[in-house]
Each structure stands twice: as C-alpha cells, then as structure tokens.
C-alpha cells in the first residue's frame, strides 16, 4: 500500500525492539495494529459515503449495462442474416428437346428456297459463338425436382 518492502519493515521492527525493549514491544505492536485497523475502517467508511453521494455505483452499473447491451447488439448483427437486395439474374437460353422427326423437317428448307451451288471454295471455320435459339415449337426439357421452379 505504501511501497514498504520486507527489509524496511524488518529494520523498523529491530529499531522498535531496541527502543522499547522486549517487555513493552508486544503491547506497542498490538496498539499499532489497532490504530492501523481503525484508520482502514474510517478510510473505507469515508470512501463509501463519498461514492454513495456521487452515485458511483449507479454510474458503474449503467456503464456495465451499456457495455453488455452493445455486446448483445454486435452478437445479433453477426448472427442475424444480412438483408441484401437480391440481384436480378440474367435469363439463360432454355434448353429444349426436339422430337426426332420434327427436327429434320423443321431444319430442311423448302425446295424452292434451295440456293444454287457455290463455287468450290473452302468454307469458313465455324466460330465458337453460340447459335441463336430456334423458335420452333418443341417440347421443353423435363423439370428436375431438385431445381427451383422456373419463371413463366
């Protein structure tokens, strides 16, 4: 409390033994202990009275409650799912299954639209671009029950 080490206390005890003598030293130590106890009790009583007057307990309780509330709010933010606006999904070309006979009939042009044969030149290499979807009536792919429902 006062920053007194054991060696300093031992030195004070030796001086007291030399000054008071062995007969009066136990009584003096008892009296000193009583005085120290009274000082501690009076100091604690004054401290409690001052704290009571300024409301330190109430302030401490409020600070503690505010700290707990802020921790609970942070926990709720972490545990609660975030409310984000769903981003629109770009439609993907729908896969279709053509009937075997309908595909050959639909793809074959009429005889009147058949172009004249071209000169023998090499055909250009096909590109990797996807072809446009065919707008022929066809049956749609069967719905997989594990996928979400399709939009109309």
Curated annotation (Swiss-Prot):
Membrane topology: Single-pass membrane protein
Xref: Pfam families: TatA_B_E
Its job: Part of the twin-arginine translocation (Tat) system that transports large folded proteins containing a characteristic twin-arginine motif in their signal peptide across membranes. Together with TatC, TatB is part of a receptor directly interacting with Tat signal peptides. TatB may form an oligomeric binding site that transiently accommodates folded Tat precursor proteins before their translocation.
UniProt keyword Cell membrane present: yes
Compositionally biased tracts (Pro residues): 116-127
Similarity annotation: Belongs to the TatB family.
GO BP annotation list: protein transport by the Tat complex
Spans traversing the lipid bilayer: 1-21
Protein transport recorded as keyword: yes
Bias type Low complexity, positions: 98-115, 128-142
Record's keyword terms, sorted: Cell inner membrane, Cell membrane, Membrane, Protein transport, Translocation, Transmembrane, Transmembrane helix, Transport
Classification via Gene3D superfamilies: 1.20.5.3310
GO cellular component: TAT protein transport complex
Subunit structure: The Tat system comprises two distinct complexes: a TatABC complex, containing multiple copies of TatA, TatB and TatC subunits, and a separate TatA complex, containing only TatA subunits. Substrates initially bind to the TatABC complex, which probably triggers association of the separate TatA complex to form the active translocon.
A single GO molecular function term of this UniProt record: protein transmembrane transporter activity
Residue segments, region Disordered: 98-152
Protein name: Sec-independent protein translocase protein TatB
Subcellular location: Cell inner membrane
């Amino acid at each position: 409390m006062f920053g007194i080490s054991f060696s300093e206390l031992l030195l004070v005890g030796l001086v007291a033994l030399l000054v008071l003598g062995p007969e009066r030293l136990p009584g003096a130590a008892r009296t000193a202990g009583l005085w120290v106890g009274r000082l501690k009790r009076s100091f604690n009583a004054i401290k409690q009275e001052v704290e009571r007057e300024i409301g330190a307990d109430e302030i401490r309780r409020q600070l503690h409650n505010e700290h707990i509330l802020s921790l609970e709010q942070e926990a709720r933010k972490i545990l609660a799912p975030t409310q984000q606006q769903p981003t629109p999904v770009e439609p993907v070309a729908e896969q279709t299954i053509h009937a075997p006979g309908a595909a050959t009939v639909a793809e074959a042009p009429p005889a009147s639209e058949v172009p004249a044969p071209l000169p023998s030149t090499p055909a250009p290499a096909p590109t990797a671009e996807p072809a446009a979807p065919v707008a022929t009536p066809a049956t749609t792919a069967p719905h997989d029950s594990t996928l979400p429902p399709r939009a109309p």
